[in-house]
Structure formats: C-alpha cells, structure tokens
Amino acid sequence: MSDAAKPIDPGALPTPTKFLIFAVMAFGQFMALIDIQIVAASLNSVQAGLSAGPDEISWVQTGYLMAELVMIPFAAFLAQALSTRWLFALSAGLFTISSALCGMAWDINSMILFRVLQGFTGGAMVPTVFATGFAMFSGPQRAMIPAILGMVSVLAPTLGPTVGGWLTEAIGWRSIFYINIVPGALVTLLAINVIKVDRPKLSMLKTIDYSHLAAMAVLLGGLEYVLEEGPRRQWFEDDGIAIAAWVTLVALGLFIERSLRSGGPIVKLSPFRKPTFAFACLFNLVIGFGLYSSTYLIPIFLGRVRGYDSLEIGTTVVVTGIAQILSTVIAARLSTRVDARITVSIGLTLFAAALWLTSHMTSEWGFMALLGPQALRGFAIMLCIVPSVTLALGGFEAAELRYASGLFNLMRNLGGAIGIAVVNTWLGDNARIHVARFGEALGEAGRSGTDALGTLAARIAERTPDAAQAALVMQGELARVVGREALTLAFNDVFRIMAVLFLAALVMAPFCKPPPLAGAAPPPPDAH
C-alpha cells in the first residue's frame, strides 16, 4: 500500500500535538472506565425502571464486562489494521451511540444488548491510549504517562459511585447514560481530526484467524460470566456455572494453540517471552484484585452495616480519590529517580498496611475512622500502578507495544473480576461462620448474657405490650445486631487476607529487570 511507504513516526510529532492527542485519548479512557461504576451505583433504579428481576439486572453489568474483556486484547490487532485514529474514533462514536440507546432502552433485553455494544466499544479505548502514549513520548515525558493513566484508571472507580448516585437521585437513572453523549461526541470529532500517529494496514483484515477470535471470545466471555455469576449461584453447584467453566477451559486450550501456531493470530503472546513483562502482569493482576475489591467492599460496608445512602457513601470514599491525585506527581517523580522494583515494593507494602488498618473496623466506623486507611490506600495504589506500567511496557517498540499493552490491561481487569468474585464468596462464608460463633457465644455467656438479653427484652416490652409481638421484635432485633456484627467481622477477615496477598506479591520484585531511569544520564551509544 502507498500508505505503508510513508509511515508516521509518532515520536516526531510536535510536542503540543502529542499532548493534545494524549489528552483526547485519556479523556476517552476515563469516560469508558467511569461508566462502569456509575451504572453499578444505579442498578437498583435501573431495575425498578425496567421492571427487571434480580437475575436479569445483573446482566446489565455482566454483559458489559464480558464484551469489554474480549475487546481489550483484540484492540492491538484492530489498531494496526484500521489505524489508531479510526479505531479510537469508531470506538468513541459507537460508545456514545450505544450510551444513548441504553438511555432509551424499553425493556431489560434491549438494555443488555446495548450494554454489550457499549462494553465492546469502550474496551478498545483503554489499551490503545497506553500504547500510543508510550509510542509518542520518551524520557521524562514518558514517565508521566503511567502516572496520568494510572490516576485515570483508579479515579474512575472511586468517583463513579458518587456521580452515579447523584445523577440518579437528582435527574433519574436514564441520565447516567445520556451524560456520555456530549463528551463522547466531542472525543469522536477530536479523534478524527487530531489522532494521526500511524496509518491503516487494511490487508491485515484478510488474515484474521476466526477460530482464534472465537476461542478468545468464548474464553474471556466465559471466564467473566463464571466470575460474575458464580458467587450468586453457589459456584459449581449450579449446572450452568459448571458447564460454562468446562467450555471456558476448552476455549483456553484452543486459544493457546492458535496463538502459538496461527499465521494471523488476533493476540500475540510473544511479550510473555520477557520475564519482566510476565512478572509485571502478575503485579497488575494483584493490583487489579486489590484496587477493585477494596473499592467494591468499602461502599458495601457503608451501605449494609452503617446504612449510608449513595451520597453519604460517595462523600466518604472520595478521600481515596483525593489521595490518588496527590500521589500521582510523587509517583511520576519517583519513576525517574528510583528503581521501579523499589517503588512497586513500597507501594505494595503501604497498600497492605492500609488493608490491615481497615481490617480493624467496628460497626461504628464512618468517615473519620476510615479517613487514614483510605488516604493511605489511595496514596499507595499509585506507587503500585506507575512502576508496574513502566516495568511492563518500558522495553517494547512499535507493534509489539500494542499487544503488550492489551495483555497488560487485560490482567488488571481479570484481577478485578477475580477479586470481586472471590471476596464476595469470602464475605458470605465468613459472615455465616461468625453468626454461628455468636450463637455459640450467647449460649455460653452465662448469667451476664442472660441479664443483657433480659434488659433488651424489658425495653422492648415497654414499647410492645403484646407478649407474642414483643418476642418477635426481640428476635428480629437480636438477629439484626448479630448479623451486623458478624458482617463487620467478615469484612475484617477479607481485608486481612488481601493484606497478606499484597505482601506475598513482593517476592516477584527481584525477578524483574527495570528499564533505564528516565531522569538518568544518557546511556552510552551501545547501551541498546
């Protein structure tokens, strides 16, 4: 093709142009990421508005996440075939259209269909901006890329519940989709006009290995389905989950076989030949586990134990976002001066410390009690994300960088999916254990326990003269208190286990080989 004879060097673009391109793409990424959390915070209102059942409404999120997970690794291939410009513009445009369609959904089936389209198109924007940023910038400027994109990645799940709750209460649930229209249209127009960093290779579309594509779709879609629906359906006790798991396992085998033997693979696994990239992906898996799980657990605690509404929850968790913003600059500065292995080790240790502090919650914890642990967690996560991105993507060039970016981002999403599924299971199991222990403790409490129950019964009897009704009220009050305290202890158990997981991840740091520091003296000519 004539286009191929005149390749574009993204690194040679004028600096203002590079920053404009990066800003447009980063905003598109933020729009796609925050949408997940905005909708998650408003699912109850969407369910009521569409008259959907509990099992049906879960597919509004599951469908989106399944489609997004499939697109993330596929984006590298499409970026080469269509060019970064047209892939990003098409993704932003279709994401905007599907958002509008979600807002106009007339029943749960139409909503699920439009959410799948929204997830598929949104998934292309996330890895594309990482690869483009690393291709355009070098030196100290490149060091800012993982910091800024890391901040975007963690701010979205932090701010999403606040924005979603406010929009739903102030305007209505359909507004959470309509809000994407204006910024989405703007990103689409800007993408068409400014993102000119490479040229399309349309001939690649003729080389698509459809069996490889199908295997990847079944593998990632099936895995997301099992992880999302498993906790609700008692995992493999449910026939549907068991069948999906077997199908996913078969798809994994076919995916690996086609990745290694196909002449036109959709996803290239060659980046894993570099041990540092493989370990950085494992870091990202753990980071995704901790980031999304902790962001999921704190609002659940505040809602179920403290009885907070959406606005109160948002006000409490926003502390984490503020700490993330403040730590972004520090993380970026460290990336040019400190070995990435040291920085990520500090980040993992601080994150583990924050989780350990959170594991001492009582049922009375609110904004002030959570302030310190949340601020520390927000500060620490940036010290985890920035060096892990540097370790993963710092040693790749050109096309391979796209595949590495897709695989790396996929790991964080998988970590989040695995994390939420696992902590849901841990939470339910541990809560039941603590309820049983409370029952045993009450039975063994002796006179002091009997006196306490007698005092409670007397207070209830004063308000409820009918003896039978008073007994029912007392049983309900006792069950509520026991359930609340058992759930609080279960939350603490989960945070404690997560803290140990982050400390265990430290063993991988010595096996990584960091790229040269961006702020270091220029390397000798033969350094590469």
Question: Can you say where each PLM-predicted feature lies in the sequence?
Answer:
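Short, Lys/Arg-rich, polar N-terminal cytosolic tail immediately upstream
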Residues: 1-13
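Hydrophobic transmembrane architecture of multi-pass small-molecule transporters
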Residues: 11, 413-514, 519-528
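Transmembrane core module of solute transporters
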Residues: 16-80, 99, 109-111, 127, ...
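Helix-loop-helix hairpins in multi-pass membrane proteins, especially solute transporters
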Residues: 74-216, 229, 238
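Short helix-capping/hinge motifs at transmembrane helix termini and TM-loop junctions
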Residues: 106, 138, 194-198, 231-232, ...
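Small-residue-rich alpha-helical segments with characteristic i,i+4
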Residues: 156-159, 294, 370-454
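Central mid-sequence intracellular linker of multi-pass
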Residues: 181-223, 234-235, 240, 267-273, ...
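C-terminal membrane-cytosol helix-exit motif in multi-pass small-molecule transporters
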Residues: 181-199, 218-229, 247-261, 506-513
